[in-house]
């Protein structure tokens, strides 16, 4: 059992100083180096006299210096806000505006100009490591202090910063390293694929650091080169794979992604989106002896609230795979619209309670009050997901209650996509609509668009209009949010209340 994340990392720095904590294509860093480097960076941070417990934004990819900076910030009592190098400039600015960080550590060059906040460059981080300054922890992150803050998308187009405390993190980490479903080995050798800005990353780094294992990362240049990416992954000595199911689907396009070629790979941990029967079946065909874990949970409940080991019998029995047994310390309920707990077999909203529930959204009391509450005397969160329990206390997923979806592993709010499209000077009104496949998984995003007067006459083809709209919004819209197909209409259907009838459009798209 882990009682303190930093003390555990420090323990391994003493017990196994030469054991690799990080490996990027053979470029290794040991636990001893992580302690030395994080101490040096912590000394630099402490010298800046930042506000007590103020959050710090860290911008970069899957590099070792990101990890060392996170550990350093925890040692100095600051929560870190991981922002991925592939983030759109407008999103970076929005996060900075909302979070008001006291410092920005730019492991990669920032895509925006910042004057009002001190920015520490990679060169300064390298200089700090070279100086090998001593550091003594006096006020590290503890208890209810924020450990990290991860930004998700918001319904108004504004991202929301989910505050995860040290206590939240320990609740998740101890469940994962002790639970029989995960069956995680000592010194796990984990693939570090999801970006640190995606809370699925916590599923690989937290148990790995808690058990003295190794993180296998890939350089940022490889992320967009899928052929090279997956051929490289097939050569890594990883034992545990953590990703969205969609990423595994892409990996299976490579014939070398199989048990024969990757005999060390024995565990698959999935979260972030629904694991379909077809993906699980294909994976068992490639890795017949593998342990496949289907986990479920929102960022607001610290990564996951339930998990289950998928069996071959389940694949033949269920049309939609179960999402697991709830964490023992996190009572999970199904409630009706009046807030009453329902019996097994009855479908309603999934709510989670207990020590893994976040304190809320950073600097956003209104959204916090909407989603977080108290249930049976415990902190609770409305997931917005439909679900039910079996008689054996297994949680079943029934889809989204609202128009928030999971697509390509990312949680996307359709209103967010629509709001971004409506910023185009070519668009009068637009609405994003998901198309589902037969396994209830979002297959792609479509956009229904009404053009501004005179726009259509400027283009020869609809394809050219689509290219122009995409070009006009690309600087403030994440690539994964961009619809793959645009449908042009003279007007959009309305509800009796005068709102765009999104349900009608969803039904139209999925029954063509």
UniProtKB/Swiss-Prot annotation:
Entry superkingdom: Bacteria
Binding site for D-alanine: 199, 303, 499
A GO cellular component entry from the record: cytoplasm
Residue spans crossing the bilayer: none
InterPro entries, per database record: AA_adenyl_dom (IPR010071), AMP-bd_C (IPR025110), AMP-bd_C_sf (IPR045851), AMP-binding_CS (IPR020845), AMP-dep_synth/lig_dom (IPR000873), ANL_N_sf (IPR042099), DltA (IPR010072), DltA-like (IPR044507)
MF terms (GO), sorted A to Z: ATP binding; D-alanine [D-alanyl carrier protein] ligase activity
One BP term from GO: lipoteichoic acid biosynthetic process
E.C. number: 6.2.1.54
Residues the entry annotates as binding ATP: 152-153, 294-299, 385, 397-400, 499
Subcellular location, record wording: Cytoplasm
Keyword Transport listed: no
UniProt KW keywords: ATP-binding, Cytoplasm, Ligase, Nucleotide-binding
The protein's role, per its UniProt record: Catalyzes the first step in the D-alanylation of lipoteichoic acid (LTA), the activation of D-alanine and its transfer onto the D-alanyl carrier protein (Dcp) DltC. In an ATP-dependent two-step reaction, forms a high energy D-alanyl-AMP intermediate, followed by transfer of the D-alanyl residue as a thiol ester to the phosphopantheinyl prosthetic group of the Dcp. D-alanylation of LTA plays an important role in modulating the properties of the cell wall in Gram-positive bacteria, influencing the net charge of the cell wall.
PANTHER family: ENZYME, PUTATIVE (JCVI)-RELATED, PTHR45398
Protein family (similarity comment): Belongs to the ATP-dependent AMP-binding enzyme family. DltA subfamily.
HAMAP family the record matches: DltA
Name this protein carries in UniProt: D-alanine--D-alanyl carrier protein ligase
């Amino acid at each position: 059992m882990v009682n303190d994340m930093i003390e555990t990392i420090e323990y391994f720095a003493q017990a196994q100083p030469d054991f690799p904590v990080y490996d990027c294509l053979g470029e290794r860093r040991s636990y001893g180096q992580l302690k030395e480097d994080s101490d040096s960076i912590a000394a630099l941070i402490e010298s800046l006299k930042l506000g007590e417990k103020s959050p710090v934004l860290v911008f970069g990819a899957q590099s070792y210096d990101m990890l060392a900076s996170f550990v350093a910030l925890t040692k100095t009592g600051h929560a870190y806000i991981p922002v991925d190098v592939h983030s759109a400039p407008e999103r970076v600015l929005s996060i900075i505006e909302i979070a008001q960080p006291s410092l920005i550590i730019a492991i990669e060059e920032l895509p925006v100009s910042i004057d009002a906040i001190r920015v520490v460059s990679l060169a300064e981080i390298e200089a700090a490591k070279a100086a090998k300054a001593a550091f003594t922890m006096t006020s590290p992150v503890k208890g209810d202090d924020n450990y990290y803050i991860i930004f998700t998308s918001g319904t108004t187009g504004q991202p929301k910063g989910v505050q995860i405390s040290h206590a939240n993190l320990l609740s998740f980490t101890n469940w994962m390293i002790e639970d029989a479903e995960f069956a995680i080995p000592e010194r796990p050798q984990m693939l570090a694929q999801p970006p640190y800005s995606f809370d699925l990353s916590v599923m690989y780094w937290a148990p790995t650091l808690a058990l003295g294992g190794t993180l296998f990362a890939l350089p940022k240049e490889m992320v967009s080169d899928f052929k090279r990416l997956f051929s490289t992954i097939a050569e890594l000595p990883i034992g545990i794979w953590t990703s969205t199911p969609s990423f595994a689907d892409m990996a299976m396009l490579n014939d070398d992604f199989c048990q024969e070629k990757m005999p060390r790979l024995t565990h698959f941990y999935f979260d972030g989106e629904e694991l379909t029967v077809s993906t699980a079946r294909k994976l068992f065909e490639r890795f017949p002896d593998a342990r496949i874990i289907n986990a479920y949970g929102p960022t607001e409940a610290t990564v996951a609230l339930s998990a289950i080991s998928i069996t071959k019998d389940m694949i033949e029995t269920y049309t939609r795979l179960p999402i697991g047994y709830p964490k023992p310390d996190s009572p999970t309920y199904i409630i009706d619209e009046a807030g009453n707990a329902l019996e097994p077999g009855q479908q309603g909203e999934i709510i989670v309670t207990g020590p893994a529930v976040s304190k809320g959204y950073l600097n956003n009391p209104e959204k916090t009050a909407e989603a977080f509450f108290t249930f049976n005397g415990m902190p609770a969160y409305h997931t917005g997901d439909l679900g039910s329990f079996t008689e054996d206390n297994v949680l079943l997923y029934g889809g989204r209650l609202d128009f928030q979806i999971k697509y390509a592993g990312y949680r996307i709010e359709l209103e967010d996509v629509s709001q971004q499209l409506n910023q185009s000077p070519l668009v009068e009104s637009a609405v994003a609509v998901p198309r589902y496949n037969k396994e209830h998984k979002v297959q792609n995003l479509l956009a229904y668009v009404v053009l501004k007067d005179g726009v259509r006459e400027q283009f020869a083809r609809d394809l050219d209009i689509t290219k122009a709209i995409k070009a006009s919004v690309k600087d403030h819209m994440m690539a994964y949010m961009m619809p793959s197909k645009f449908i042009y209409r003279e007007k959009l259907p309305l509800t009796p209340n005068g709102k765009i009838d999104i349900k009608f459009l969803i039904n139209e798209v999925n029954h063509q």
